[in-house]
Structures are given as C-alpha cells and as structure tokens.
Amino acid sequence: MDVIVTIQHPAHVHFFRNAIEELEHRGHDVHVFAREKDIAIDLLEAYGIDHEVIAGRASNLPGKAAIQLAYEWRLFRRARKIGPDVMMAIGEPGVVHVSAALGCRDIVFTDTEHATYRKRFVYPMADRVCSPEFYQDDIGENHVKYPGYHELAYLHPDRFEPDPAIAEEIGLAPDEQLVVMRLVSWEAAHDIGDEGIDDIADAVERLEAEGARVIITAEGDLPPELEDRELSVAPERIHDLLYRADLFVGESATMATESAVLGTPAILVSTIEGMGNVRELRDEYGLVFSYADGRRHERAIQKAVSILDGDEDWAERRRQLLADKIDTTNFVTALVEDDATSVDVFRNPALPDQ
C-alpha cells in the first residue's frame, strides 16, 4: 500500500515514527509531508525519516489561513501523483480534504477535546477518527476509542529504553534532583487566550532553593537571566531527560503526559481545563497535578516543593498505568492494514486481543 502521513507538530513525529518504520518494514510505501513547526523538521532528520517540507510558518491568523490553503494545494498535487491507499494525520483538515478529493481512505487521530474547529469541520468529514478512551466527546459512527495515549506510541516500554548517559551529558550528579520545565508560546489556534506560569523567574528560584537543578525547554525566547537554564541536549533526547527527572513542571499537556507515562510526576500549569488525559492521569493514576485557577502559580510551586521533599513510589503508579494501556503504535499499524477488523476488536471487548 501507499500511505501518506502529514506532520504538523514535533509531537506528530514522535507519534508516527515507529508506525512509519513498521509499515515500511512490512513492505508498504510511506510518504511523509511536513510543515515547519518548532523542531519538527529537526526531529524528522534526527530519526532518518524521509520527508518533504511543503509549508512554512505564520504568526497571525490571516497568514495561517494563507499558508493552510497553499499547504493543502501542494499536498493534493503530490498525493494525486502517488495515488495513496490511506492518508493519516493528527487532527489535520488537509488530509480529510485531499483524501475526499482523491477517493482514498483517511485516518485522523486526536486527543485534544478543546479543538473546537476540528470537531465541527474536520472530524465529521473523516472516514475514521481515533482517540484514547479518556476522550469525552462522542464524534459519531466514524469514531473509535482505544485504551492508550498518543504518548504510548513512542514511550511504551516496548518502544522506548531510556539512556542513562543523559545525566553525565548534562553534568548532573547521581544524587542531584532534576526538574524539567516546559514553556509554550500560546500561539496554537486552540491555545489562544490561555495562560500558564505567571512568573517564570520566581518558579525557577523557588525550585532551585530546594536544591533541584532546573532545565527549561521553551517554544519562545527566555528572559536573559534564565538563558543558562535552557535545554542544551539534542531534541530527540528530551525523553531520556524526562525519564531521569524527579519532576516536570510546565504549560504543556503533551509533555506532562509524556512525563507521567515515564513515571515522572508532572505538574501542569495552564488555564486550559477539561482535558481528558489530564483528568485521567490525575484522578486515576495520581501522576499529574493540574492547576488552572487564579492561584495556579502559587499552588503549583507549593505542590512541586512537596513532591521534591517527598518519597512517593511513582514507579508503582506507572506500573498500574501500563497494565491498563496498550502500545498505541500497534493500534495505528493495525488500522492502516485492516481498519474493519481493528475497529471491531476495540469496540467489542468480547473479541480476543489482536
């Protein structure tokens, strides 16, 4: 089969990279088209994934609309030459539009409940929409839920083995506590109007006062006084760093989830509320702590200090999570090769595991 995958964000590279490798190993031709977004292209190159960049960046809504139109036209022209059997993406309208024009099958993955535009104008047109079980909305007959997370497509123990050398690379002493902090730009369409950590310098100062080392990864520029805390390792090593960390504090639900499935407690500071993955990881597994109200900054720092001073068994909480969840990459590849059977397995618990 010919399979087209589109990449809109660095997280999409992680989500699809193992599926791309497996599908190619099974004899399928996988064609990857990407748009520039943060370190997405760097990751594709780091993992050796052949790809073509067909869209750039924009910082305002008119610019984003123009780039989206150009992107979809370029995607259509390339897909028409390929004649794909399947096109897949994460929450991306271009794949749905182009697959409809070409008469091929599309698969759209999502785990973002507050993406209102997609729910209204993308998912109803898709052949198949796939989400984790925590996803609270019912999209329709084309919707199938699976027991996992996007992040388990690349951080399931069958897919990821942490490299302990990361500690030496960043000069971290064996008994030194590490906090990874993630700051987002709030420019994504579904993030506009939301906020996170009120005072970054204050957060860093108070965490370091506990004896922890703070490393920051940010979508934008850091204040000059914090530039020496910025992440200095290759972007594909971030998950080794999260595994080694004693705590994650940040504004990214994706990275909070990554930390949680690796067994690192995560504090999410964001005014975005109602995310199913955060709710499940908080209420069922106790691996994420979220703060969204007007006192979010102070409450988050207080919780961070208590975690650094505590002795909870986070590894046991991770074991409980993994016992309940699947390797998401297996689900992705199964859908590509046999959609009907795969969907039946996940919709009918009486059927045997496949």
Where are these regions (language model features)?
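A nucleotide-sugar donor-handling region in carbohydrate enzymes
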Residues: 130-195
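C-terminal amphipathic helix plus adjacent low-complexity
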Residues: 309-354
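A donor-sugar binding/catalytic signature common to diverse glycosyltransferases
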Residues: 87-93, 241-280
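Catalytic binding pocket for nucleotide-activated donors in carbohydrate/polymer assembly enzymes
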Residues: 261-307
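Donor nucleotide-activated moiety binding/catalytic core segment of transferases
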Residues: 70-75, 221-255
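A conserved, positively charged/aromatic
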Residues: 107-109, 118-131, 242
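Conserved nucleotide-sugar phosphate-binding/catalytic loop shared by glycosyltransferases and other
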Residues: 24-67
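Catalytic donor nucleotide-activated moiety binding site of glycosyltransferases and closely related
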Residues: 37, 47-51, 55-58, 181, ...
